[in-house]
Structure formats: structure tokens, C-alpha cells
Amino acid sequence: MVHQLSLVSSIPHNKYLQTISTLQALTGLIQPESISTYTLLAKPSYAFKPKFEPGKVNQIEQYYMRCITTWNSDKQGDDEKVEKGFDISEPFINKESNIVVRKLFTEEDSVERVWTLQVSDIPVAGKNQGCCQQQIYESTLVHTHTAIEIKVGNGDPIDIDTNNDKQGDNNTDKPKQEHDGKLPEAIDEDIIKNGDEKKTTHDDNDSDIMEIDEPNPETQTLPQSLSNGVSQRTTRKDSFLIFLSDLGYEVINQYWQKGVRFFYGDIIIEIYKIFIRDESSQADSNEGIKLKLLDDSNQFQIKAYININKSTEIDSINSGVKELIKLQEFLKNLFVLEIPDRMFMDSRIKQ
């Protein structure tokens, strides 16, 4: 958990080089840190509907969750060759610029990825606020997407759960889940249906509940008997999307972030653009995902923030607010840092 102090702004694309040069002189960083993050937006699969009773106040809330990891940018040229990376300082024109990113949830993707799960509270309200103050709760996990082929002989049963001594009926109750390397935007109904079937199975059989310390990979089911002389393969998968479904969340959106990051004392300054999937693209799915700008105006978003360990550290919070105000005053002729509207930063699910 962190208590984040922040100010935001935006600049047109033609002021990017001037802004970068100014921040390089201010921070002393000739080469800023690169930002390439991929974010999944998820919401709880089941809405909480509290029972309203006279004189009783229910404080239980549900929140949207952000799942953040890194991504690699691939730019495809006219000669059909894929070049690694692209220059964020170049303007991007939707339907003309060709930005293709590699899929994450494929059988070939065996990279160990670090995912950060974030849930943020609504910012602090009140007048005369020097900056936005918000509580952010986060957890980090390491996950590797796997797809392992297992050859099955004639009539050999599949042991779905090696830690479970029960076979037979329990094996046939397991739902079949096939993803074939699809992205979250392509797995709309499959994940939801499979998640619902799995939750029902878990309710009926408490011994199949997934343990966080030792997660069991999902396995396809096969018939108990196979025809003579025929071998069949099954694929055991461990997908991050399955983990979210087991956690009780479903993916509703996604976006990519590309930019640079500066450090000025305790202040982190990020300059970035946000990309989304180009739904109008007819490119082959094997080539990857084509992106387009979320904002057609080509503006850069700017965020300056400080993370405080605890909200009870009053001295650190007051010192951080003063530092952000000083930075705001110093850069006022370049761009104006301001407090974002707290209502747009409310991640609570409306009942």
C-alpha cells in the first residue's frame, strides 16, 4: 500500500523535444528511463448487492483492478520486416502509422512476467489541496504462461489433479478450457463461461479449491477410453487469464503505455502516450496486434507523483506536497501541472 501524491498535465506533440530538454537539464538525466507497460482492466465477476436495512450502514465496496506488466514494441515496415521498438518522439497518425505488438498470451510466450495488481481508492476530498492524494493497494506476482503437450496412450485416463487421489467422476467434472493463445479481447465468452463452471465445481467439491502457494495448472479432459491404435494429445495450460477468473475477476478492457520517466529527488515525472487496439485493422492475428492512439490529437500525458509508504506519515506527506508545488511553480511556463478531477479517478463499481 502506498499513499500517492500527484499532479497531472498534457502537452502537444510539438513541445515534446523542448520538454525533454528542459527535464534533462533539471534532473541531470541525459537518458531517461523508458516506459512500456501493458494494462488489463478487470472488474469483479459477481456484483455485490448489499441488503439495505434501516439504521445500518454498509461499507463494503467493489473496485476495478488494474493488472500491469511490461511489453515489447514491434514496428513493421513496408518491406514486411519487423523492427524492434519505435521512436515515441515521432508523431503517430491513426490508419497510417503501423505499430504492431507481440501477443502475450500465446503458447510460444514462455517469458516470466511480473504482474502488479492495483486497486485504488477515491482521492482525498477537501478544499485548498496542494495536490491529489490517493491510497493505492497493490500486490506483485511472477507468472509464466505455459502450454505443455502431454501424449496420451490408448485407454490411459488423464489425472487432472496429481494431488487429488479421487479419480473418475471428479475428473469428468472438470471443465474443458481451450485458449489457443488468444488475447483477452478474443476470450470474451469462453473465460466467463469457464470461470462460472469452475466456480460451481469448486462449490460442490471443496477439495478442488486452488491454493495460492501451489497453484495447479489447468488441464484439458479426455474421454476415459480411446479407439485402438489412436493416440491423442492434451495441452496443460497455466494462463494469467485463468488466474484472474479464479480470483473472481473478468477482463473488460486493455491499453498500452509508451513513454519516458525522469527522477527529480523523490518526484517521478512520466511523459507518455496511451495506445489501444485498432479494431478496424484486418491484419492477420499471427502478426500480432495493431495499435492506435487513444487520443487522435497526439498529445502527451504528464504525471508527476511521489509515493509515501503510509498515510500516517504526516511529515513526509507535507514535505512531498511542498516539493510538488515547487516543481509546479518552476515548470509553469513550460506546462501547467494541476490536480485531476477526483471523480474521474474513482474506481469503485457503481451499484
From Swiss-Prot:
Record bears the keyword Nucleus: yes
Primary location group: nucleus
Biological process according to GO: positive regulation of transcription initiation by RNA polymerase II
InterPro entries: Mediator_Med18
Compositionally biased intervals (Polar residues): 217-231
Pfam families with a match to the protein in the record: Med18
Region (Disordered): 153-231
Acidic residues composition bias: residue spans: 205-216
Assigned GO CC terms: core mediator complex; mediator complex
Keywords from the named record: Activator, Nucleus, Transcription, Transcription regulation
Biased composition annotated in UniProt, kind: Basic and acidic residues: 163-204
Segments passing through the bilayer: none
Locations listed in the record: Nucleus
GO terms of molecular function: transcription coregulator activity
Disulfide bridge map: none
Transferase keyword on record: no
Gene3D superfamilies attached to this UniProt entry: Hypothetical Protein Pfu-838710-001
Family: Belongs to the Mediator complex subunit 18 family.
Subunit structure: Component of the Mediator complex.
Protein purpose: Component of the Mediator complex, a coactivator involved in the regulated transcription of nearly all RNA polymerase II-dependent genes. Mediator functions as a bridge to convey information from gene-specific regulatory proteins to the basal RNA polymerase II transcription machinery. Mediator is recruited to promoters by direct interactions with regulatory proteins and serves as a scaffold for the assembly of a functional preinitiation complex with RNA polymerase II and the general transcription factors.
The name this protein goes by in its record: Mediator of RNA polymerase II transcription subunit 18
Organism: Candida albicans (strain SC5314 / ATCC MYA-2876)
Organism taxonomic ancestry: Eukaryota, Fungi, Dikarya, Ascomycota, Saccharomycotina
